[in-house]
Amino acid sequence: MNERTLRRIDLLSAALLMLWAGAALGFGALMAPVLFRELPSRDVAGHLAGLVVGRLDWAAWAAFGLAGLSWGARWVAEVKEELIGPLRLWSAAWLVALLMCLASSAVVTPKVRAIRARIGAPIETLAKDSPDRVAYDRAHAISRQLFFLRILLALGLAGTVGLLPRRQEESGPEA
């Protein structure tokens, strides 16, 4: 693979990550507060927000998965680098983002849905010290943290994908 192809793949990766981060940030910072303020029930607002977050989770899988093309293209091209260089650090951050996607969509979101289904009533009707309310609040807090950490990772990965090596370095003795 030549440098031009790698540059195009990097631009595609950055664009997808920025697109997802913008959508997630727009929802998290702008739309979710409006839902909870304007809708008559926090339960309805939470249900709608949960549906949107579920779709953003799937979009995150797509964005982060396709961003892996930047790493995969370098692997195919056998781009070499130092032991701890930008490619390895970027790859580690990318894997962390994928693990966060997995945790969110396979562990936390199903747990929140199971708690809501088990309760069968609006969350705010439960006492603050109710075991279901405590479990729901904890899962919801973890969900929010994973959501915003993935936004930060998407922005970081998009901003640094251009720093990844693009050509195979000749390994020779250094003087």
Model regions and ranges:
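Helix-loop junctions at the membrane-solvent interface of multi-pass transporters
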Residues: L39, A73, V107, T160-L163
